[in-house]
Amino acid sequence: MVIPLSEGDGTAAPSGLRSFVLPVRGGDCRLWGGHHLPASASEALPLLVCHGGPGVPSDYLFPLIGQLRRPIIFFDQLGCGRSDRPSPGEQEYSIAASVQDLVEVIQSLVLEGVIPRRDGLPAYHLYGQSFGGILAFEALSVHHGSSRPGPPPPRSLTLSNVPSSVPVLLEEVAALLAVLGGDGARFDATHVCRTLPRPPALVAAYAPGHPGSDWRGVDVIADWSATERSLGALALPVLLLAAEHDFVTLRSMEGWQRLAQQRLVVLPGVAHHALLETPEAYGASLESFLQDQEEEANCAVSST
């Protein structure tokens, strides 16, 4: 069920987003969601956005609105941002639990028509940035061959700045940090976000007054890697967005090269928050990929 929120509700988002609530985990917890509709009518399919962190709310991805010509659906993961924050624990804040939340989110959005149907099937694109990409990938692959119902498959998946192996990522981070003499501030300015002053959307996501997060950082994903089985199970177009100076290096993304239908785009001169550093180039790469998938699908339908 998708429950609308009034503008005066404390969980409401900035203007331009229609806020709503998504009950998960049997209705015991509520996730905040935000729905953007373009000013002019569009036949483009919606993009469902999974933010990263773990635990950085959706605010830093709101600039997607200005770069894409389509509906966009955001949500804050449990324990983060405007969503409910149950008591911290391994069961509440785990990849498996969050993957199931995402599955329920997608199912609710389809049921309520926020995700439309085309030719009788739910029609949307799925996008994950950083940790959000891990959740998106797991949601689509973990149910392969399982008796548990998974989400309806999207038309495409975008993995933006997402490692295929967190252990390899941690090795890369240690090496990059060593080159900088262990200077965390220089690492941040070189490999996290190279734009100064910091983009307002990123400042907002980390602001002291923000509802915040109960996630415990990278520790919850330290052992995660995409398995050969899950890589082989994913049979849909995938856009891999990388950045020249990102701490999520190409080496830490090598596993994604084994996906059957993948397109790699490396954005020059930017780091982990490439959307905020070079929004036009980022948006053009993403929108071009999404349009390509929709055009190919339309051609396939018209030829049958």
Region roles according to the model:
Residues V49-G53, S130, A243:
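Glycine-rich His-Gly loop
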